[in-house]
Amino acid sequence: MNNYVKLLNNLEELGLLNIKASIDKYIDLINSGNKSIVDALYELSNLEINAKSDRAMQACVKVANFPFLKEVTDFDFDFQPAINKQQILDLMTLRFIENKENILFVGSSGVGKTHLATSIGIECAKHRYSTYFISFQDLISQLKKALSENRLDIRLRHFCKYKILIIDEIGYLPIDIDAANLFFQLISKRYEKHCTIITTNTNFSKWSNFDLVL
């Protein structure tokens, strides 16, 4: 077995499959004098670094529990002219994360709230910010179950660990006193620490009704 074959075997053993796939091209470039050894090694190492980054990004997107993978480029702003496109594009820069700002999408069903919230969430996940998507009903169901099992603090800490938490469809179904209490416990724990993105069909002026049940 010659050293070339041993090299290929070593690369596979180390899991450096991107380098293995490109090694012949770079050997030819070096032999022809079109690439220095240092440049070749640098570019080959970048192939692995980029692949590792892509895998990490895909893992972040996968665990985020998105209902679908739609990005802002898939959104039809012409269909919803009332939506400020520039404002959405500004949110896609993710400046709101460093400022620990929250995002609230308000509107009736079918206007694209979930699509836009998901698009922002995907961008966050791609930049390897811990992100999680959950419907309000599922969130409250989990918190109520945890409360009944005397482990509410553990579950609240679970949802507080995410840098970006997306809570979808608040107000889609009636909210009882227990649900309101649990929701505001979570929000108060996340406030000014991490970012929360909320979609709701309830006008912001009516959110004071939540305070009444408390």
Where are the regions a protein language model picked out?
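Interdomain "pre-motor" coupling segment immediately N-terminal to P-loop NTPase/helicase cores
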Residues: L8, E12, L16-F68
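Walker A/P-loop
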Residues: F105-Y129
